[in-house]
């Protein structure tokens, strides 16, 4: 847990970035007294070498993300993630991703394989890690900060939880020796800031929503980044909320 202090103002900003044909990325900031105190990234995409998430980060004057989540290994959520790892993460960055199934990446795209290779090299290095790399399943607390007014007038929790992927489905698949890739592994996030809650649903699909326990989705949601680009494969989410 980290402590963040402010004197006059505390703001939360979220930028949901969509590209013309495909690809999405999300950037969020905690802003204290008009200065960014915390920067988070969910997924990456770029076109013609231009990454809008990186532009937003650098515009704030910060060089690194505090929090990065790679929700799942599809190109429309991945292109540019290798550059994020190499240039915009440091030893204090909390890097979260979907669970590893195996080290065999043959069935993935070239971009995903390259990103995996970078992650494996960081994990296997005997030297100090470049960043903390963790995998997420439902009901993980991924981050917690206490934002306190130095005048004592207010104290607010900032927390990030994962509600997906489903440990129930992944455990059953592992026991059966079944390997499924893609959206089944997608990380879904809940961000709480004070009394507000934001859902970033990645590409979580119906199969996962069907088995999630109620307490994983018990928060009143103020903002939803809908799952899987609004596809019918994720249409039961409103029924679960």
What are the functions of these language-model segments?
Residues 102, 218-241:
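Long, structured stretches of catalytic cores involved in phosphate-ester chemistry, encompassing
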Residues 65-76, 224-228:
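Metallo-beta-lactamase
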Residues 38, 88-95, 128-131:
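A short helix->loop->beta-strand "cap" motif at the edges of active sites that frequently abuts
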Residues 45, 73-79, 229-235:
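Acidic, metal-coordinating catalytic cores used for nucleic-acid/nucleotide bond scission
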Residues 61, 86-91, 216-220, 240-241:
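Short, conserved loop/helix-junction motifs that constitute active-site signature segments
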Residues 1-64, 135-223, 231:
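Core dinuclear metal-dependent hydrolase active-site scaffold
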Residues 78-90, 106-117, 236-239:
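Metal-dependent catalytic neighborhoods of phosphoester/phosphodiester hydrolases
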Residues 66, 93-103:
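Short internal beta-strands
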């Amino acid at each position: 847990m980290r402590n963040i202090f402010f004197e006059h103002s505390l703001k939360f900003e979220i930028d949901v970035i969509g590209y013309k044909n495909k690809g999405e990325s999300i950037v969020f900031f905690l802003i204290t007294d008009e200065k960014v105190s915390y920067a988070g990234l969910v997924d990456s995409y770029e076109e013609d070498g231009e990454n809008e998430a990186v532009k937003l980060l650098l515009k704030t004057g910060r060089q690194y993300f505090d929090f990065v989540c790679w929700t799942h290994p599809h190109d429309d959520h991945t292109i540019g993630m290798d550059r994020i790892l190499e240039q915009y993460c440091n030893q204090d960055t909390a890097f979260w991703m979907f669970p590893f199934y195996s080290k065999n990446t043959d069935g993935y795209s070239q971009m995903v394989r390259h990103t995996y290779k970078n992650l494996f090299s960081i994990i296997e290095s005997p030297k100090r890690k470049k960043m903390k790399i963790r995998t997420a399943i439902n009901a993980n607390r991924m981050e917690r900060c206490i934002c306190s007014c130095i005048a004592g007038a207010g104290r607010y929790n900032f927390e990030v939880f994962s509600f997906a992927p489903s440990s129930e489905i992944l455990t059953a698949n592992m026991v059966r020796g079944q390997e499924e890739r893609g959206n089944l592994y997608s990380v879904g996030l809940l961000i709480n800031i004070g009394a507000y809650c934001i859902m970033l649903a990645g590409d979580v699909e119906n199969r996962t929503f069907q088995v999630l326990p109620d307490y994983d989705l018990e928060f009143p949601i103020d903002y939803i980044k809908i799952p899987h680009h609004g596809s019918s494969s994720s249409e039961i989410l409103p029924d679960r909320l």
